[in-house]
A protein has these predicted regions:
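Aromatic- and glycine-rich beta-strand/loop motifs that create alpha-glucan
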Residues: 1-28
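Helix-loop-helix units of permease transmembrane domains in multi-pass membrane transporters
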Residues: 82-115, 278-279
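Terminal transmembrane helical anchor/hairpin motif
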Residues: 3-5, 42-59, 183-269, 273-283, ...
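Alpha-helical transmembrane segments of polytopic membrane proteins
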Residues: 65-66, 143-154, 247-258, 322-335, ...
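Internal/C-terminal transmembrane anchor helices
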Residues: 295-298, 341-378
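Secretory targeting signals
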Residues: 57, 111-173, 186-189
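Long, hydrophobic alpha-helical segments
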Residues: 62-91
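Cytoplasmic membrane-interface regions of multi-pass membrane proteins
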Residues: 7, 91-92, 170-172, 267-285, ...
């Protein structure tokens, strides 16, 4: 008799694979084209002129940078498919009526999506190693590094997408949470620095963003680097191979570890998630005010500054921006964002009377921000 307390359910796993195979097939086809097919095409085209350095660069560049692109998008697609039952009341009730624990449902669904991605990457790069065998590439420093990089990236992006699926009961809200979450913190830092630089004496808003690592795709692409290995012959240097830098591998490993922590958080959330929250924009009552005021603040900072520049700023000379005008535009944008969030949560346009108190809080905070900036309270 099957144990109902197992953390993995084979029957559920097979059922999930049946629903996942079209996406899995498309994902596999892309990887096969990018690695073994492209490698074979290059070898055939150059007919002996294709060096080991060329092959190592193709493998590493595809695994590292191609992996960022594919994992970013397909991690979301696999998460949406694996946890699609959380966005349909009938499916949610059906899953939660199964004689298994929530942990079993979560881990089985999570591992299904992860298995599809990691198994595809494994097979693809093993085929790539077979195609490049005549060039005698180092397996671990080239193929292994490229394959490992792609796997680490897949773990992070997929785990973050799963967390986004936990936070909402609307299938179309998950991509919004996912894309915004991947750029939110450094984006807001940049906008706030720009805002402060316009009105605080002696403060430059054009310094580098300190929290860029919290935008994983934008941080990984330039920071994860491929190093060239050169050999000197007759006073000339030739690139003989490429390898993944140790620092680059540690960056990807750190993101993958963060992904596992994120997956654990998603599991803890799933254990307490109520079935009746299916269909809600925000799946947890405690997160509702965070969502409302977060949307209001982000809209105020982003859209408000754009609105001021569009209406007034482009006609002002450098250094003559109006703080009251900027705050007014930010307050207007913040109120739009707040009521838009209220409409999404309540699923109704009739939110203005009930949301008046929250709107007043948003406007008040932004006015206080303007007062603080005018007196330069930060020193």
């Amino acid at each position: 008799m099957r144990s109902a307390t197992s953390f993995f359910d084979k029957t559920l796993f097979r059922s999930q694979l049946k629903h996942t195979w079209p996406l899995w097939l498309g994902y596999t086809a892309l990887w096969l084209f990018l690695v073994p097919v492209m490698l074979f095409s290059e070898l055939s085209a150059y007919q002996g002129g294709y060096s080991a350095a060329d092959a190592s660069y193709l493998l590493l560049n595809t695994g590292v940078r191609g992996g960022i692109f594919l994992s970013f998008f397909f991690g979301l697609f696999f998460a949406m498919l694996a946890f699609s039952h959380l966005t349909q009341s009938r499916a949610t009730n059906g899953f939660h009526a199964l004689p298994v624990r929530r942990e079993t449902i979560f881990l089985t669904a999570y591992l299904t999506g992860l298995f599809c991605q990691l198994s595809t990457i494994l097979v693809t790069f093993l085929l790539g190693a077979a195609v490049s065998a005549p060039l005698h590439l180092s397996f671990w420093s080239v193929t292994g590094a490229a394959m490992g990089s792609a796997m680490l990236e897949a773990v992070f992006f997929y785990s973050f997408a799963v967390l986004c699926m936990m936070m909402t009961g609307q299938i179309l809200a998950a991509p919004v949470f996912y894309f915004v979450g991947n750029i939110l913190v450094p984006g807001m830092e940049y906008l706030l620095r720009n805002f402060a630089g316009n009105f605080l004496y002696g403060y430059s808003g054009h310094t580098d963003v300190a929290l860029g690592f919290l935008s994983p795709p934008l941080y990984m692409y330039p920071e994860v680097d491929i190093a060239s290995i050169e050999t000197c012959e007759s006073d000339s240097y030739y690139v003989t191979a490429y390898a993944l830098e140790h620092r680059s591998f540690m960056i990807l490993a750190a993101y993958a570890l963060a992904g596992l922590v994120i997956a654990l958080i998603a599991l803890l959330l799933y254990r307490t998630r109520k079935s009746e929250m299916t269909g809600s924009t925000v799946a947890f009552p405690w997160a509702t005010p965070i969502f409302k005021y977060g949307v209001a603040f982000c809209t105020a900072v982003a859209l408000g500054q754009f609105l001021y520049y569009f209406l007034f700023g482009q006609y002002c000379s450098s250094g003559s921006d109006s703080l009251p005008g900027t705050i007014l535009c930010m307050a207007a944008a913040g109120l739009v964002g707040y009521f838009a969030a209220e409409m999404l949560i309540k699923k109704s346009f009739r939110v203005f009377r009930a949301g008046a108190k929250g709107a007043a809080i948003v406007a008040g905070v932004l006015v206080l921000l303007g007062i603080g900036m005018s007196f330069d309270l930060t020193g």
